[in-house]
Amino acid sequence: MITVVVTFSIPSEVSASVLEEKFLETAPMYLETPGLVRKNYLYDRATLEAGGCYTFQDKKSAELWFNEERIAWITERYSAPDIRHFETPVIVDQDTGLIDNPGY
């Protein structure tokens, strides 16, 4: 599994409710994203940062999703993103009570 953390700056004039609306507008497309297991939208009012935390089945799926076009889309919609990829060797799931060890 691969976890991708994306952050970007939000202008101070964009309210939390407007940002939430923007997030809800895009949420349906993630139901159709190949290889995506989960996406969490992120927002920090104190630092005016937002973004997403994505869990992908594999590195290839993550790389295909975060291509040049996707980065340009994020930049146009919000601002230039910082994108970090992490291997996810162990996952603890409170909902199922399971610990998954997909390894590296």
Predicted features by range, described:
Residues 1-49, 59-67, 84-104:
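Short S/T/G/P-rich N-terminal loop/turn motif that feeds into the first structured element of a domain
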Residues 51-54:
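A short, exposed loop/beta-hairpin motif centered on an aromatic-Gly-Thr core
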Residues 69-73:
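RNA recognition motif
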Residues 75-87:
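Conserved short beta-strand edge segments in small beta-sheet-based binding/regulatory domains
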